[in-house]
Amino acid sequence: MTNKDESVKKNTESTVEETNVKQNIDDSVEQAEESKGHLQDEAIEETSDENVIEEIDPKDQKINELQQLADENEEKYLRLYAEFENYKRRIQKENEINKTYQAQRVLTDILPAIDNIERALQIEGDDETFKSLQKGVQMVHESLINALKDNGLEVIKTEGEAFDPNIHQAVVQDDNPDFESGEITQELQKGYKLKDRVLRPSMVKVNQ
């Protein structure tokens, strides 16, 4: 082979090699571009996912805030409801006490009038006019006592009962063999209660 042919061969090989290198470079560039494109697509997808998350998070936060507010309002409502129920019970109890005290004052003022009526009924007389008048007074007395009993008035039991300093007032001591020691032998003045309240203790004679 001549020097010329050898030179041509080398040039040809160099050209082929350059072409291959260029092709490899082009392929690498293309692959790099494709990889870059994939990375950009993935970045876009990740960005989209982040946007979705960013869009969801505020909603969840708002829901949590509303739930917390609802819980707080429910707690306030239950507390206010309990306070209102306690207030109603307290007012009802105060009204009942006030009614009792009002009735107590009225009945206490009436008791002397009842005593006078009962003393008048103890007077004896043979005159028909007197008897008729006494019968009318007795009917008034019974009606008054029944009306007062319907409103809680109660006569305190005395004779034969054991002396109770909470409802009885001992004014005289007695020595009666027909009664046990500490028993009431005689009632000197009637005592009255209004439900569980003593309006006036009974004045009694107590056996020794």
UniProtKB/Swiss-Prot annotation:
From the Swiss-Prot or TrEMBL record, state where the protein is found.
Cytoplasm
* Biased segments, Polar residues type: 13-23
Q: Which Pfam families match?
A: GrpE
Keywords, sorted A to Z: Chaperone, Cytoplasm, Stress response
A Gene Ontology cellular component where this protein is annotated is: cytoplasm
Main location group: cytoplasm
State any single GO MF term: adenyl-nucleotide exchange factor activity
Compositionally skewed regions (Acidic residues) per UniProt: 42-51
Q: Does the keyword Chaperone apply?
A: yes
Report biased composition (Basic and acidic residues) as residue ranges: 1-12
- What InterPro entries has UniProt attached to this entry? GrpE, GrpE_coiled_coil, GrpE_head
- Asked whether the keyword Membrane is assigned, the reply is no
- Residue segments, region Disordered: 1-51
- Any one Gene Ontology biological process term? protein folding
PANTHER family from the xrefs?
GRPE PROTEIN, GRPE PROTEIN HOMOLOG, MITOCHONDRIAL
Give the quaternary structure: Homodimer.
Task performed by this protein: Participates actively in the response to hyperosmotic and heat shock by preventing the aggregation of stress-denatured proteins, in association with DnaK and GrpE. It is the nucleotide exchange factor for DnaK and may function as a thermosensor. Unfolded proteins bind initially to DnaJ; upon interaction with the DnaJ-bound protein, DnaK hydrolyzes its bound ATP, resulting in the formation of a stable complex. GrpE releases ADP from DnaK; ATP binding to DnaK triggers the release of the substrate protein, thus completing the reaction cycle.
Similarity comment: family membership: Belongs to the GrpE family.
Entry protein name: Protein GrpE
Q: Which organism is it from?
A: Staphylococcus aureus (strain COL)
Gene name tied to this protein: grpE
